[in-house]
A protein has these predicted regions:
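Internal helix-loop-helix
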Residues: 49-108, 112-118, 159-165, 285, ...
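A short core secondary-structure module
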Residues: 146-147, 151-198
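Glycine-rich phosphate/cofactor-binding loops in nucleotide/flavin-utilizing enzymes
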Residues: 2-5, 69, 73-74, 93, ...
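Amphipathic, small/basic residue-rich leader segments at the start of a protein or domain
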Residues: 1-88, 109-116, 245, 265, ...
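A structural signal for short hydrophobic beta-strand segments in well-ordered beta-sheet cores
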Residues: 139-142
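A short, Trp-centered hydrophobic/proline-enriched beta-strand micro-motif
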Residues: 117-125, 169
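Glycine-rich beta->alpha junctions and the first turn(s) of the following alpha-helix
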Residues: 2-5, 195-291, 353, 360, ...
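C-terminal helix-coil-helix/basic helical segment that borders enzyme active sites and/or dimer interfaces
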Residues: 28-35, 268-275, 286-342
């Protein structure tokens, strides 16, 4: 959005655009709600066969090994056609973590199925008493010989009832101080005995999230990632990837297109005041794209994102909410309906888009927590 393609990049963009037009099912285009894995995986498999499912992964692990600019081009073209987000927990979260911290055996076991789309991953972080204050987690894992015994509960776990594996933070030393020092990073087979999964109906009407209960679940010791009690350090590395993924400008670009579609249909596009607000929103989306590209470049160079991950999480999530507020304004009275609105310019599900945007400032670290991080780490304020 803020740069010009080289001739080679322009050719690559046209290749991506042409292939997406020919291969992305119409039923998946422009979907406001994230399709469940059962609907999404055929598209995932098609991208995998093309070699495009993981542009940011190195070739040695089955990825595309794309340059930064190629990754940006793919993000823009996926947004342009309204492609749905792929399951992020495998591609953007545990995959990069295993590349950095996993054993050779863990990489060999788990990375190829992520690329192939034969295994779906869930993230086991939040608990009923530990959300933004994640260090308060209480799910216990006791090492007994060559295995751990896990007891406890996770909540707000995305697509757990469709997943095969979970990466989770568990408490292995309840006496450790600070609390972060007693946390370990484990891989759990969700088909193991003692695991119960209960979907949660959300305000948007979907059941994307679940509660997960662990009743004396046996986890082999070789499923430990990194060292015992060192999970917090790994989790911090993962949070950088997660905040990058949740602030991907693809979502903002798609929201901007929904606003334009709705504004043309309602007639408000001719209003100068609305045009001014839309222009300001477009500038913010361009700024997010620039910030995202900078963060991706640091990440690709193996550098820690540090405070940048908090900055992009705040800006990206709050911008998405602001865009959906503008979508409500563009829809006018039509925003009161609880079903997609058919227009001459395409279908827009205004209510679902608005409701789903409410949670983005909470998951992955709330805006309040991120501002505290910036206050401490950038401004050197106490707390």
């Amino acid at each position: 959005m803020f740069r010009h393609d080289t001739p080679a990049e322009a050719d690559f963009r046209m290749d991506v655009r042409t292939w997406l037009e020919a291969n992305l099912p119409v039923a998946l285009r422009g979907r406001t709600a994230r399709p469940p894995p059962v609907e999404l995986m055929p598209w995932y498999h098609k991208l995998s066969r093309k070699g495009w499912v993981a542009p940011h992964w190195p070739r040695q692990h089955g990825g595309m090994g794309a340059t930064l600019n190629e990754q940006i081009i793919m993000t823009e073209e996926l947004a342009r056609i309204g492609a749905p987000q792929l399951p992020a927990q495998g591609l953007n979260h545990i995959g990069p973590i295993l590349m950095a911290f996993g054993t050779d055996a863990q990489k060999a076991q788990h990375l190829p199925p992520i690329i192939a789309g034969t295994v779906i991953w869930a993230q086991g972080y939040s608990e009923p008493g530990a959300g933004s204050d994640l260090a308060s987690l209480s799910t216990r894992a006791t090492l007994e010989g060559n295995h751990f015994v896990v007891r406890g509960q996770k909540i707000w776990t995305t697509w757990a009832h469709h997943s095969d594996w979970m990466f989770a933070l568990v408490r292995t030393d309840p006496q450790a101080q600070p609390r972060q020092a007693g946390i370990t990073f484990l891989l759990l087979d969700l088909h193991s005995p003692g695991i119960r999964i209960r979907p949660i109906k959300t305000i948007a009407g979907d059941d994307e999230f679940s509660e997960v209960f662990f009743d004396d679940v046996i986890v082999p010791a070789e499923n430990l990632v990194g060292k015992l009690h060192d999970g917090w350090r790994i989790a911090n590395a993962l949070l950088g990837h997660e905040r990058l993924a949740t602030s991907n400008p693809q979502f903002a670009l798609m929201a901007l297109e929904r606003i334009k579609t709705m504004a043309r249909a309602s007639g408000i596009m001719a209003d100068p005041t609305f045009q001014e607000r839309l222009a300001a929103a477009s500038i913010d989306v361009t700024a997010l794209s620039a910030l995202f590209s900078h963060a991706v470049e640091l990440n690709n160079q193996g550098q820690s994102l540090g405070p940048e991950s908090s900055m992009i999480k705040i800006f990206g999530s709050e911008l998405l909410q602001a865009l959906n507020d503008l979508l409500i304004e563009a829809a006018g009275g039509h925003a009161l309906t609880d079903r997609p609105i058919a227009t001459d310019f395409g279908e827009v599900d205004v209510a679902a888009s608005f409701l789903q945007s409410r949670r983005v400032t909470i998951y992955g670290g709330s805006s309040e927590i991120q501002r505290n991080v910036l206050a401490r780490r950038v401004l050197n304020l106490p707390g």
